[in-house]
């Protein structure tokens, strides 16, 4: 019989000063939940969007290099190499969100997800990161849409055009064409959220 784990609220926690006991309890819980170093997970687009670094027993590499179509993970990590740490840089003034479209529960893999990170200054987007999950074998960064958003206010028109650019050239399979519309909606939602 398992005992439910209390829901954590990271917005109320000081994540810099977690106690050793809490870290060990969380590690045990996470070991029973799944693996975050797989490309289909919810966390991989977030790690790419936030410029995380993956530390292993032998090296450190950007998340974008670990989750890539160019190389297989078996080519990235040696058989005796383990992921030991994930560093996410703290960037002042960055608004980051993760939106996930799924049919059932939060434990489902995303049918489409979007990790977004924006830096705003005076109501203008200074920088943007848009990384999709669930639409490709690895997290899919949309740099053309990021460039388009830079220097613009988060308006309806800007959101529409960013969504169009983000999905430009998308070639869905016959039975998952809906993902294009869902992905466009997630981009629009992420941009318009900045107006609040």
Give, region by region, the residue ranges found by the protein language model.
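C-terminal structural segment of proteins
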Residues: 40-196
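Ferredoxin-type iron-sulfur electron-transfer modules and their immediate structural context
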Residues: 1-44
């Amino acid at each position: 019989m398992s005992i439910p784990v209390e829901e954590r609220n990271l917005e109320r926690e000081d994540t810099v000063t977690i106690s050793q006991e809490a870290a060990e309890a969380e590690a045990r819980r996470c070991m029973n939940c799944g693996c975050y170093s797989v490309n289909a997970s919810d966390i991989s687009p977030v790690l790419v969007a936030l410029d995380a670094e993956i530390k292993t027993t032998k090296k450190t590499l950007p998340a974008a290099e670990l989750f890539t179509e160019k190389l297989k993970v078996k080519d990235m990590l040696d058989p005796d190499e383990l992921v030991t740490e994930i560093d996410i840089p703290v960037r002042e003034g960055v608004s980051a969100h993760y939106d996930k479209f799924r049919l059932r529960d939060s434990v489902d893999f995303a049918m489409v997800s979007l990790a977004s990170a924006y830096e705003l200054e005076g109501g203008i987007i200074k920088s943007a990161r848009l990384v999709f999950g669930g639409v490709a074998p690895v997290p899919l960064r949309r740099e053309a849409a990021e460039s388009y958003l830079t220097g613009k206010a988060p308006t309806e028109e800007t959101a529409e055009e960013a969504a169009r650019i983000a999905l430009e050239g998308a070639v869905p399979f016959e039975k998952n064409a809906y993902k294009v519309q869902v992905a466009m909606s997630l981009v629009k939602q992420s941009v318009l959220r900045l107006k609040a």
